[in-house]
Structures are given as C-alpha cells and as structure tokens.
Amino acid sequence: VIHATDGHAEWTASRQPQVVILGHFDGIHAGHVKVIERGLKYGREHGLPVALMTFHPHPKAVFGDERYARCLTPPKEKERVLAQLGIDRLYIIDFNLSFAQLQARKFADCLCNLGVKHAVVGFDNRFGHRGEGSAELLAEWGEGCFTVDIVSAHNDDDAKVSSTRIRQCLAEGEITKANQLLARPYLLRGTVIHGDARGRTIGFPTANVDPDEPYVIPRNGVYAVKVKVGGMWHDGVMNIGLKPTFKSGETRPSIEAHLFDFDADIYGEEVTIAVMDFLRAEQKFDGIAALVAQITADAEEARRRLASMEGAPALESVFQG
C-alpha cells in the first residue's frame, strides 16, 4: 500500500511498468469487480503488475457532504477485499482541497511518470479539477505513454450498479438487494466491548460491537447475521438501534449480536459481521416479557432464513476465508 499525501510526488518512487485501475471503488461492488477483473486480465496477459489507485477520504466528504464521511468499504476493509481479488499494489491518494485543484491533464502526466502502460477506467470516471477529465480524455492524453480500456456500465434490473444505490438499500433495510449489488454480504468489522450486560439477564447474551472504521451503518432494526470469531463463522441475530424499551434520548445506535449456540467470553476480540437479511424495524415493547417473546421469534426466523441461504455461490468465498 502506497499512501500519497501531496497528490503525486510519492508516486514516482514506485515507478515501474504497470497496469493501473482508476476509481474511488467505495463498496467494491459487482460493477467495480468488472472493472478490476479487466485490469487483472490485461496484467496477466502482458506480464505486468496490477495496481489500483483510489482516494480517501471520499471526495464528496471533502466538499461537505457528511453522509460520505462513512464508507461501504473504509480503507482497511478496501485493502482486504482488493488483496483477495489479486491486486498487487494499492495507491491511496489523500484527497484534500489541494489535490482537488490538480488539473486533469497534470493527473494524466502523473500516471505517465509512474510508469503506467495501461489504465482501466469505468465509462463514467471523472478526474482532475472540477471533474474536467473523462475516460475519453485520458485515452487521448495517454497516447504514446499508456493505453486506456474504458469499461461500460454494469447493470442490474436495467439500472446501473452503483455505490449510491447500495447506500440507499442499507438506509432502507433492503439488505438482500444491497448484497446482490455487492455480489457478497455487506460486512462490518469491529471490537467487542462491554455493554450494559442486559441481554444475558434475559437469556440472550449479546456481543456489543464497536466498528473499527467509519462504516455505513444499515438502518436501525433486527437482522439475520453471520459472525466470524477467532476464524469460525457463527449464525446469529443482530440489533442495530437505540434500545427504546430501556432507554430514551439515546442518539448513537448500538450494534449488538446474539450468536446461536455460543457462550464464550469474547470481550476485546475483533469480529466480522456479515449482514445477511433484514427481519424487522426496531420497536419499543411494553415490558421485558414482550421483548423476550419477540427476540425468541426473531432468533427462530433468523435461523430459518440463514439455513435457506446455505451454499449460495456468492457467499462461499466470504465464509471459506
């Protein structure tokens, strides 16, 4: 991983003939994978290492849209997924107001100075000051230095697969659709912290998870999940929310997962949560008995839905690793 803090000076330190795949790639969804696979294929055929160049923080966050302070794949998560896909090198450009002033033609020159022989971009890729650079202009400016492969849109139900659509799905609890667009389950990683231990007193001990990075958090509600602890995956049910039965005035949602047939002490451990399906919205109950009855029903429904997903091809690569 190479971090460039001023936009381009550090790039030349790693100058060598290479393929570079360009884009933000938040989520690394099915459309992104199509672009990445084109770059990997070219690299294999021509004996060249394949790099991916991305930006952090999200450009929209830099320009004031706080929704984009959270990512579908924050930096470490993105690094993990790209390594699994076979990317040899990752350039993370520190996107700031200074870099945003970089002229598009200058950016193309930087790629040439980096030793790029072939660039792969999505059809709608924009770069440079005010997004003045396009895939077509990159191909024109790269003549004599590098070739450019422009990858067409990847559609699902006649609409382009996009990070924006996935964010919207997560905000609405449309987890099945989000996972379909991602071509894998949506993942959250975090550390198990001490909570109020109320779950254990009512027969449903939970792991309170503090996310390790600024992930986009799905809407408040109850979910069927798989949780990876110490290299093993466990089925479970998760609640994201404000726990209105017990608290009022809370504004920061908590993430609590109850793992089925599991009773180990995992405080302080890092866990990975694969969000598999949305069960219901969060609700306030009149008392403990009503809450316990609903959690029992949620657990049964989560078991049923998770059992129906066993062996699904899109899930196998995640749960075998």
Question: Could you say what each language-model-derived stretch is?
Answer:
Residues 101-205, 286-292, 315-316, 320:
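Classical nucleotidyltransferase
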Residues 82-83:
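ATP-dependent adenylation/nucleotidyltransferase module used to activate substrates
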Residues 1-10, 70, 91:
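Short acidic-hydrophobic, aromatic-tinged amphipathic segments that line or gate anion-handling sites
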Residues 88-93, 97, 117-121:
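Divalent metal-dependent hydrolysis catalytic cores, especially in the metallo-beta-lactamase
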Residues 47-51, 88-89, 117, 147:
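Residues at the starts of beta-strands that form the adenosine-phosphate
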Residues 70-78, 100-107:
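Glycine-rich, highly charged phosphate/nucleotide-binding loops
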Residues 10-74:
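N-terminal catalytic cores of NTP/NDP-binding nucleotidyl/phosphoryl-transfer enzymes
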Residues 195-321:
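Phosphate/ribose-recognition catalytic cores of enzymes acting on nucleotide-derived substrates
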